[in-house]
UniProtKB/Swiss-Prot annotation:
Disruption phenotype: Abolished the production of phomopsin A and does not result in the accumulation of any related metabolites. Residues 19-35, 42-50, 57-65, 72-79, 86-93, 100-108, 115-122, 129-137, 144-151, 158-165, 172 form a propeptide. Pathway: Mycotoxin biosynthesis. Residues 1-18 form the signal peptide. It comes from the Eukaryota. It comes from Diaporthe leptostromiformis (Lupinosis disease fungus). This is Ribosomally synthesized cyclic peptide phomopsin precursor phomA. Keywords: Repeat, Signal, Virulence. Ribosomally synthesized cyclic peptide phomopsin precursor; part of the gene cluster that mediates the biosynthesis of the phomopsins, a group of hexapeptide mycotoxins which infects lupins and causes lupinosis disease in livestock. The phomA translated product contains a 10-fold repeated peptide embedding the hexapeptide Tyr-Val-Ile-Pro-Ile-Asp, that is converted into phomapsins. After being excised from the precursor peptide by kexin proteases, the core peptides are cyclized and modified post-translationally by enzymes encoded within the corresponding gene cluster. PhomA is processed by several endopeptidases including kexin proteases as well as the cluster-specific S41 family peptidase phomP1 and the oligopeptidase phomG to produce 10 identical copies of the hexapeptide Tyr-Val-Ile-Pro-Ile-Asp, that is further modified to yield phomapsins. The timing and order of proteolysis of the phomA precursor and PTMs are still unknown. Two tyrosinase-like enzymes, phomQ1 and phomQ2, catalyze the chlorination and hydroxylation of Tyr, respectively. PhomYb, is proposed to be involved in the construction of the macrocyclic structure. The keyword Signal applies. The gene is phomA.
Length: 172
């Protein structure tokens, strides 16, 4: 991927404006964090993210709207750069090798099959012989309440709601 100056500047700006986020989190729980951690430019009264994408003054368009190269057909290059073969199909639709003997896409059977006739991926997760369980079923730490830690590490606020349930901004 080629980094144009516009992309580098936009990335830098987004990093620079994210710095005040830690201070902003201490605000009212009635506001979603996302609603106020994006810095507001006081002169313009706009969220910084609304204008940090460089604007091409000649065209009046956000650079991201046209940095995907446009070819002479007036199409975005990304719309057709997946090579099209003579059959009129995108190469990606059939480049997964086909095993001519089986008539199957190789990806359907390249997962090694063991002598039990099972795909290796079905049982390579280590099995704890004492418990007879796949290790992944219990490596998430269990606390004294008998609950998986992942079930409650999302912070719960005073309303009894998981924080993640309400930090997504709601349009008022």
């Amino acid at each position: 991927m080629r980094f144009t100056p516009a992309i580098v500047i936009a990335a830098f700006c987004s990093l620079a404006v994210a710095a005040p986020a830690a201070k902003a989190i201490a605000r009212s729980p009635s506001e979603a964090v996302e609603d106020y951690v994006i810095p507001i430019d006081k002169k313009r009264g706009e969220a910084v993210e609304d204008y940090v994408i460089p604007i091409d003054k000649k065209r009046g368009e956000a650079v991201e709207d046209y940095v995907i190269p446009i070819d002479k057909r007036g199409e975005a290059v990304e719309d057709y750069v997946i090579p099209i073969d003579k059959r009129g199909e995108a190469v990606e639709d059939y480049v997964i090798p086909i095993d001519k003997k089986r008539g199957e896409a190789v990806e359907d059977y390249v997962i090694p099959i063991d002598k039990r006739g099972e795909a290796v991926e079905d049982y390579v997760i280590p099995i704890d012989r004492k418990r007879g369980e796949a290790v992944e079923d219990y490596v998430i730490p269990i606390d004294k309440r008998g609950e998986a830690v992942e079930d409650y590490v999302i912070p719960i606020d005073k309303r009894g709601e998981a924080v993640e349930d309400y930090v997504i901004p709601i349009d008022k």
